[in-house]
Amino acid sequence: MSTENTTRQAETGAAYDATAKQKAQAKTARIPIKVVPAETLKKPDWIRVKAGSPTTRFYEIKNILREHQLHTVCEEASCPNIGECFGKGTATFMIMGDKCTRRCPFCDVGHGRPDPLDVNEPANLAKTIAALKLKYVVITSVDRDDLRDGGAGHYVECIRQTRAASPETRIEVLVPDFRGRMDRALEILKTAPPDVMNHNMETVPRLYKEARPGADYQFSLTLLKRFKEEVPGVPTKSGLMVGLGETDDEILDVMRDMRAHDIDMLTIGQYLAPSGHHLPVRRYVHPDTFRMFETEAYKMGFTHAAVGAMVRSSYHADQQAHQAGVDGAIG
């Protein structure tokens, strides 16, 4: 069954099929805490994005991705910056398929029983990065709780093959939490470490049960701290969303926890609900508040903080890495 058909089956209320990619209501219907619709808040004037156009590299990149059977989180997660990033010739590659084993109700990536790993994916990824002549790439993935190493070995193979094909390219990875597999995953990752290690905290601990079912706040902090202990020369990075119902003080507390766990780089952006079946936006954070978060981040000792309404963890990642001291992050 094709991806298009399985997605359609999951969305139209057909009999439950664990192999189908579930999106929107089909995905969130089975989580422990139900998503309660709320009044839709009007988007403020400062929420603006640029659409891709045929005059940019937007369609060129999409065609190359399809040719090599690759996915991007830009597309799967409906990122609002896709037009700008594709237009500039940058993308965040999503490996290990397009079906996640988690059901996070803020995220637009589909849920379902994942397909077996594609053994050709690392080579296809390396060829694509070389063909696009990218100097900085971000590699992320769905959660793969079905794999004994959580997918760490596949990450390492992608890193190795990309470096073999494009030795000057800098590689950032945005990894899942490797729940229950941290020791094994870290042992594997340190054999071919990335140039930047990113794992998103996403939200404040009070909202974890609602927003990140299956995840643990302290576990995520520990993952980044332990990686830094194992590979001290690689900067660590994490990101937060605002607008899920947290307070400013709670965000500042998470930032302090990040620094206490030796996290170097920070991103904070506005949460935008992908659909009416996802968690609702509880507030739109004013630019002045984002500026306050940025100021406080540097006071706390972050080497770089990308903070703003349209910031996402991979947005302008090359510039973030360059400013944080990663050599060659900008070609």
UniProtKB/Swiss-Prot annotation:
Transmembrane stretches, start-end: none
SUPFAM superfamilies with a match to the protein in the record: Radical SAM enzymes (SSF102114)
Pathway: Protein modification; protein lipoylation via endogenous pathway; protein N(6)-(lipoyl)lysine from octanoyl-[acyl-carrier-protein]: step 2/2
Pfam families per the UniProt record, alphabetical: LIAS_N, Radical_SAM
Catalytic activity: [[Fe-S] cluster scaffold protein carrying a second [4Fe-4S](2+) cluster] + N(6)-octanoyl-L-lysyl-[protein] + 2 oxidized [2Fe-2S]-[ferredoxin] + 2 S-adenosyl-L-methionine + 4 H(+) = [[Fe-S] cluster scaffold protein] + N(6)-[(R)-dihydrolipoyl]-L-lysyl-[protein] + 4 Fe(3+) + 2 hydrogen sulfide + 2 5'-deoxyadenosine + 2 L-methionine + 2 reduced [2Fe-2S]-[ferredoxin]
Highest rank taxon of the organism: Bacteria
Locations listed in the record: Cytoplasm
Cofactor: [4Fe-4S] cluster
UniProt keyword list: 4Fe-4S, Cytoplasm, Iron, Iron-sulfur, Metal-binding, S-adenosyl-L-methionine, Transferase
Binding site for [4Fe-4S] cluster 1: 74, 79, 85, 314
GO MF annotation, one: 4 iron, 4 sulfur cluster binding
Gene Ontology CC entries for this record: cytoplasm
Principal EC category: transferase
Radical SAM core domain sequence ranges: 85-303
EC number from the UniProt entry: 2.8.1.8
Residues binding [4Fe-4S] cluster 2, per UniProt: 100, 104, 107
Entry's cofactor comment: Binds 2 [4Fe-4S] clusters per subunit. One cluster is coordinated with 3 cysteines and an exchangeable S-adenosyl-L-methionine.
PROSITE patterns: RADICAL_SAM
NCBIfam families xrefs: lipA, PRK05481.1, PRK12928.1
Family per similarity comment: Belongs to the radical SAM superfamily. Lipoyl synthase family.
Official protein name in the record: Lipoyl synthase
Organism: Leptothrix cholodnii (strain ATCC 51168 / LMG 8142 / SP-6)
